[in-house]
Amino acid sequence: MMGFIWFWLVAVMIVGYVVLDGFDLGVGVLHLFLVRTEAERRATLASIGPVWDGNEVWLLAGGGTLYFAFPLLYASAFSGFYLPLMIVLWLLILRGVSLELRNHIDVGVWRALLDGVFGLSSALLTIFFGAALANVLRGVPLQADGYFFLPLWTNWQPGPHPGILDWYTVIGGLLALVALTLHGALWLSIKTSGELAQRARGIVNPLWLLLAALTVVSLVATIAVRPASLNNYFSLPVTFVVPVGVIASLAGIWLLNRKAQPVKAFLSSCFYLFFMLAGACWGLYPTLLPATTGTDRDITLSRAISGPHTLAVGLVWWGFGMALAIGYVVFVYSKFRGKVDLHAGGH
């Protein structure tokens, strides 16, 4: 029972990160091509200024929860994914530095460079995060000792000895890029006004078409690469409500954006991300990290979980910490409600 609880607690942390940090990553991608004037750039950055660093805390908290509850998985994944983790770490550093330094430099060339770094690092982060999830769904070449190493790519095929990037994980990366860019566009349509908000709302429709197509492609590809991902759904048919939720939330984004209801459309986007991630987690359970070298080497709940006393004590502290985190999120977002000032560059 504790394994089931902690599996879904880790999933909650991942969903929280993707939903909250996802829109400011999407805003970063849009910063590359949607904004046209310096005032619009300031407004775009102001729309995420008070929340972007707090949103990233969910990533750290998720990693800490993973280490606490499933130490074997943490050790195996963080050693095997060492190369992409270092790339992600540097991208996070570059993104944060470019975002903060821009406000302290008044030289056009340097600002343009920092804008490019901010946008490019945001785009690459979304791609790597999507590819990371696809790597977990596809599986990795676990050895008998529970460890593995992945090169950046091999022959681009998701076989027994794949690389980090193959055609399947690239689809996952593109899906994440489009989904979070759309998520960011809806956020901008809420937080900004005038032509910038209109352009943000206008780009949602073409992004939605791409997202709908990539969603179908990714679901078909996942079934082709790992047919076992359907087992839990057929053993408990009521869970087919999850893919139904994906379809309903996608439809909600389209309809609510056309009705000029950006807040409700943004919430639909949140639900889309929730259902997609929940569906991926349910397709894995109780496996935490599948092995392409044989199911006997899968890292499962029973193999990776901490001791029962540790988990019971941790559950109390996790609840306390989550209450503080949720309280902080509610406070910050309630203080940050409303639109940013396009010309003042602030809220």
Residue spans for each PLM region:
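Short, membrane-exposed interhelical loops at transmembrane-helix boundaries
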Residues: A291-A312
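Juxtamembrane non-transmembrane "cap" segments at the membrane-aqueous interface
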Residues: R138-F148, F274-D296
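Membrane-interface helix-loop-helix modules in multi-pass inner-membrane proteins
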Residues: V51-L125, Q143, S229-P237
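Long, contiguous internal "core" modules enriched in hydrophobic/ aromatic residues
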Residues: L101-A265, G279
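N-terminal signal-anchor module of multipass membrane proteins
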Residues: M1-G54, L60-G63
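Juxtamembrane membrane-water interface segments of multi-pass membrane proteins
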Residues: V27-P50, Y67-A77, E100-R111, G184-I203, ...
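Alpha-helical transmembrane segments
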Residues: W6-Y17, F78-L92, G119-L124, G163-A179, ...
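Helix-coil boundary and interhelical linker segments in multi-pass alpha-helical membrane proteins
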Residues: M1-V10, Y67-Y82, L137-A144, P158-W167, ...
